[in-house]
Design a protein with these regions (language model features):
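Membrane-cytosol interface segments
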Residues: 2-49, 59-61
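Amphipathic alpha-helical segments enriched in hydrophobic/aromatic residues interleaved with Lys/Arg
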Residues: 13, 139-201
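N-terminal regulatory/effector-sensing and dimerization cores
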Residues: 33-144, 173, 177
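Regular secondary-structure segments
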Residues: 160-171, 217, 221-224, 269-273
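Basic/polar phosphate-binding segments, predominantly the helix-turn-helix DNA-binding elements
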Residues: 190, 194, 215-266, 283-308, ...
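Short, Lys/Arg-enriched N-terminal segment that forms or immediately precedes the first helix
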Residues: 198-204, 250-252
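Residue at a beta-strand N-cap/secondary-structure junction
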Residues: 227, 276-277
């Protein structure tokens, strides 16, 4: 369930740049990536994958050091590739890392670690908003009640295998980054189903009734080929335009126009992967005005043209 890219939020810079030159507006000095860089970990590879997803491979070799994460503002999935046998999280003594072991670190978490010896690991960085939209689409859940669980050294063979695939992919070319993007979204879906929890003391106030949220979600999906307006959606919800705009954002995690735009891009991705339809027909089926409008919007969202995306997603 990709997020349409706006201005990228900088979690971590490419290896050839400095951290200070790439401090993001939403992720500040406490980001996991910056913390590791300040701890003299070696950033071997880094890439933006589109949809405000970032990926990195790190190496650390040290006798012993303490590393602390403090409300990084973004979620992190860590998968150990090699080593980590003597690294442990404080307050969970005696539980150590190992290849294919995973850690899920929510954006609002705090943790302190004793790092010892060699470790080689992959990080996938993503935003809380990735869970918000998936909660509605994949689980039909109230998005405000779910968040990523704080997990240390859990095992999930499916997620670990996907992380190994990500680590083995080159990230230099557009095709490879697109494939990495698809794998990353598969990882996020598995995390949502297996490593999400209800927010502690979650009090859900305001927003749309569950039945209204479902009715709007289904109506939008059934009418993506049309020009959907706020007035039309307000009639479906039996609310004024003013109240719908406010309540929609609360219950869907984004305003109506952004949700509709995301749905159009999602449908386009599916059609490009599964069919050989001409681009003009794909554009029409997804509600874009014309092929040019579709190509422009798709490139902004996916980081590649529709043709490049289709080529990357077509098995060799």
């Amino acid at each position: 369930v990709p997020l349409i890219a706006s201005t990228p939020v900088t979690v971590c810079p490419p290896a050839s740049t400095t951290l200070d030159a790439h401090a993001g507006a939403s992720f500040g000095v406490q980001s996991v990536c910056r913390t590791l860089a300040d701890a003299n970990a070696t950033l071997e590879r880094f890439a933006w994958l589109g949809d405000q997803l970032a990926i990195a491979v790190w190496t650390r070799d040290i006798d012993v050091a303490e590393t602390a994460y403090d409300h990084p503002g973004h979620h992190t999935l860590s998968c150990y590739i090699d080593g980590g046998y003597r690294t442990e999280r404080q307050k969970i003594p005696g539980r150590f890392g190992a290849p294919q072991r995973l850690c899920a670190l929510p954006g609002d978490h705090e943790s302190r670690w004793w790092v010892r010896g060699h470790m080689h690991f992959l990080h996938l960085y993503f935003l809380p908003e990735h869970f918000t939209r998936r909660a509605v689409l994949e689980l039909d859940r109230e998005p405000r009640e779910l968040t990523l669980a704080d997990r240390t050294y859990f095992e999930d063979p499916r997620i670990a295998a996907l992380c190994q695939s990500l680590a083995q992919l080159p990230w230099d070319g557009i095709d490879e980054r697109l494939r990495a993007n698809e794998i990353s979204h598969e990882v996020l879906s598995l995390l949502l189903r297996g490593q999400s929890v209800r927010r502690e003391n979650a009090v859900i106030k305001g927003g749309l009734a569950v039945s209204t949220r479902r009715r709007l979600r289904d109506y939008i999906d059934a009418n993506l080929t049309e020009t959907l307006t706020l007035g039309e959606l307000s009639n479906v919800a039996c609310l004024s335009e003013f109240h719908l705009a406010r309540m929609f954002r609360t219950s869907f995690g984004m305003p109506p126009h952004a949700w509709i735009a995301q749905q159009r891009i999602d449908r386009a991705r599916g059609l490009l992967r599964a069919t050989a339809l001409p681009l003009e027909q794909v554009a029409a089926l997804c509600g874009f005005a014309n092929g040019s409008h579709f190509s422009h919007r798709f490139r902004a969202a996916a980081g590649a043209s529709p043709l490049a995306y289709r080529r990357a997603m077509t098995p060799a």
